[in-house]
């Protein structure tokens, strides 16, 4: 899909999608752990749909009713699962399949097969799980001899740690050691999901999982703060829009909820409503190790705010769905911003502003960042591959149309 964005201005409540980090974990854990549940407040992203298809392949029946999903679990080992381009579903499913004693072939998109997985395979291998790389670049899992010994894992991805947490939950409990956990906030999301489904996780250097015997049958899934960031940036950089959000329960479990702290002087909270006040009055700094998904939207601030943006520990961005380190630099330079790289951090500041006529990315977050930058720049811009935003935010352009003109060209 190709769209043109222009004419920024308007007032409204931007409706955010549910957190796919929570949703995918709830769906997969419910299906594999045989805990039937109703999830409320759901927006089905492409990644959520992948998790739901995996749940169906392991015997669950899924019923969708408006923004609720009912998962009726009846676990069975699948011969094959398809993980699309969802790193979360891929990595979490490996641990769950292994713990379940399954012999399963995994398929997915080529781009995902290239992303790191080895630390997880090594840790599971120490527990007797066998892996064989298939012609698609993914791994066939053989968990028939899986055990629950104490192992160690390198936490270079929080998804590796979360996968092991689910592994030991499926095994009825256990413990393991995690070293140097990156983006630990996502591990706490997994802890919350396990707690809601009847398991207590104690997270220290040694992570311990134990069943509690009590779980919820209906769960409200909170909205996604990384998606909120795009519209927050829109409101921060423009006084021609009045951007508001409505959140039933403001939770701080999601790592990306840090945006409420970063811009505490620019938001007004009144009950369930959050209102964005325009104006950036100080430099913005974000840690890519902790909040990689905030880097694309916040980089737009660097393009237009005289105070600039610092993206710390940018190496993390190179192993996301695309090389977002390169994508962020490309976007900034397209709009004429100055970018400095000291080998660890990126610094983005305004330069001689340019206005690209057409912008084309394949990464969903870069497409959304480009759309926001185009509107702040004030020049009509054609955005290609607009459909790819459905990976995390299916209604992005519908919500954007509350504050600008969005014309579908093809």
UniProtKB/Swiss-Prot annotation:
Pathway(s) this gene product operates in, as recorded in its UniProt entry: Metabolic intermediate biosynthesis; chorismate biosynthesis
Role this protein plays: Catalyzes the transfer of the enolpyruvyl moiety of phosphoenolpyruvate (PEP) to the 5-hydroxyl of shikimate-3-phosphate (S3P) to produce enolpyruvyl shikimate-3-phosphate and inorganic phosphate.
Subcellular location: Cytoplasm
Stated name of the protein: 3-phosphoshikimate 1-carboxyvinyltransferase
Pfam families: EPSP_synthase (PF00275)
InterPro entries tied to this protein: Enolpyruvate_Tfrase_dom (IPR001986), Enolpyruvate_Tfrase_sf (IPR036968), EPSP_synthase (IPR006264), EPSP_synthase_CS (IPR023193), RNA3'P_cycl/enolpyr_Trfase_a/b (IPR013792)
Gene3D superfamilies associated with the record: Enolpyruvate transferase domain
EC class name: transferase
GO BP: any one term: chorismate biosynthetic process
Subunit record text: Monomer.
Species annotation: Thermoplasma volcanium (strain ATCC 51530 / DSM 4299 / JCM 9571 / NBRC 15438 / GSS1)
Sorted UniProt keywords: Amino-acid biosynthesis, Aromatic amino acid biosynthesis, Cytoplasm, Transferase
Positions bound to phosphoenolpyruvate: 20, 87, 115, 159, 324, 365, 391
Entry annotation: catalytic residues: 293 (proton acceptor)
A GO CC term attached to the entry: cytoplasm
Recorded superkingdom: Archaea
Catalytic activity: 3-phosphoshikimate + phosphoenolpyruvate = 5-O-(1-carboxyvinyl)-3-phosphoshikimate + phosphate
């Amino acid at each position: 899909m190709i769209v043109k964005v222009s004419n920024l201005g308007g007032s409204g409540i931007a409706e955010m999608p549910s957190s796919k980090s929570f949703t995918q974990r709830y769906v997969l854990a419910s299906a594999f752990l045989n805990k039937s549940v109703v999830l409320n407040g759901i927006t089905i992203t492409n990644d959520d749909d992948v998790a739901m298809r995996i749940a169906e392949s392991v015997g669950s029946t899924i019923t969708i009713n408006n923004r609720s999903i009912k998962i009726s679990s009846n676990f069975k080992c699948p011969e094959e699962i398809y993980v699309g381009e969802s790193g979360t579903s891929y990595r979490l499913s490996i641990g769950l399949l292994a713990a379940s004693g399954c012999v399963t072939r995994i398929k997915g998109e080529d781009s995902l097969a290239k992303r790191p997985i080895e630390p997880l395979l090594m840790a599971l291998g120490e527990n007797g799980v066998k892996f064989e790389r298939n012609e698609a670049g993914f791994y066939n899992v053989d968990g028939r001899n899986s055990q629950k010994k104490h192992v160690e894992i390198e936490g270079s991805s929080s998804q590796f740690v979360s996968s092991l947490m689910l592994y030991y939950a499926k095994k009825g409990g256990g413990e393991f050691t995690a070293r140097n956990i990156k983006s630990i906030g996502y591990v706490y999301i997994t802890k919350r999901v396990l707690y809601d489904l009847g398991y207590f996780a104690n997270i220290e250097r040694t992570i311990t999982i134990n069943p509690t015997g009590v779980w919820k049958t209906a769960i409200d899934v909170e909205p996604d703060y990384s998606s909120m960031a795009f519209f927050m940036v829109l409101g921060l950089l423009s006084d021609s829009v009045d951007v508001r959000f409505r959140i039933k329960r403001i939770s701080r479990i999601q790592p990306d909820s840090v945006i409420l702290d970063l811009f505490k002087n620019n938001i007004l909270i009144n009950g369930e409503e959050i209102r964005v006040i325009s104006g950036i009055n100080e430099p913005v700094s974000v840690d890519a190790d902790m909040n990689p998904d905030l880097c694309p939207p916040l980089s737009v601030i660097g393009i237009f705010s005289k105070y600039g943006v610092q993206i710390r520990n940018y190496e993390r961005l190179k192993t996301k769905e695309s090389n977002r380190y390169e994508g962020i630099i490309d976007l900034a330079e397209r709009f004429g911003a100055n970018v400095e790289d000291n080998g660890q951090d990126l610094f983005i500041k305004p330069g001689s502003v340019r206005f690209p006529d057409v912008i084309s990315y394949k990464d969903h977050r870069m497409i959304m960042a480009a759309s926001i930058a185009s509107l702040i720049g004030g020049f009509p811009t054609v955005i290609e591959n607009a459909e790819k935003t459905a990976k995390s935010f299916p209604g992005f352009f519908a919500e954007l149309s509350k504050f600008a003109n969005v014309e579908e060209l093809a």
